[in-house]
């Protein structure tokens, strides 16, 4: 009975291939201090957003004494907590949605092809790693990057694919699409 070693080369290569599909963006880095008996001990905290640009995205927070280590920890944390967001035509959101975390509020609106990413700071990083090409976003309240990212994720978690809505209402997907086209909210093809 042959047992494979825990950290085998194949395992490492598979992990590297899996990690290579992700794009990561550094959103914020802070210098933090821990007060100890002899004075202050400085460290760094990093906020990173990771995504595959195909609808999966996550964010992570890492703290360490050195910047690269804090970024590495944040990236690993983000890869552990990925969410899937359904995209319309692989480029925008299906519907407008609000999100909130603490005092940070965001409004995300789907947009026509060619609009681009109209969003500020931390929200832009989320959309770029998610794979959204056309979106209009507005943030109000707190401008703290942590609150803005969490509020954006709150909004993205409320995105629902029209097929799921059709199933809940007991309708056919084609019927729902026809209603959407009739109301003028159809995607530009």
Swiss-Prot record:
One of its GO terms (molecular function) is rRNA binding. Residues 22-85 form the S5 DRBM domain. It holds the Pfam family Ribosomal_S5_C. Keywords: Ribonucleoprotein, Ribosomal protein, RNA-binding, rRNA-binding. The keyword RNA-binding applies. The keyword Ribosomal protein applies. GO terms for cellular component: small ribosomal subunit. GO terms for biological process: translation. InterPro entries: Ribosomal_Su5_D2-typ_SF, Ribosomal_uS5, Ribosomal_uS5_bac-type, Ribosomal_uS5_C, Ribosomal_uS5_N, Ribosomal_uS5_N_CS, Ribsml_uS5_D2-typ_fold_subgr. Belongs to the universal ribosomal protein uS5 family. The N-terminal domain interacts with the head of the 30S subunit; the C-terminal domain interacts with the body and contacts protein S4. The interaction surface between S4 and S5 is involved in control of translational fidelity. With S4 and S12 plays an important role in translational accuracy. Part of the 30S ribosomal subunit. Contacts proteins S4 and S8. HAMAP family: Ribosomal_uS5_B. PANTHER family: MITOCHONDRIAL RIBOSOMAL PROTEIN S5. This is Small ribosomal subunit protein uS5. It comes from Agrobacterium fabrum (strain C58 / ATCC 33970) (Agrobacterium tumefaciens (strain C58)).
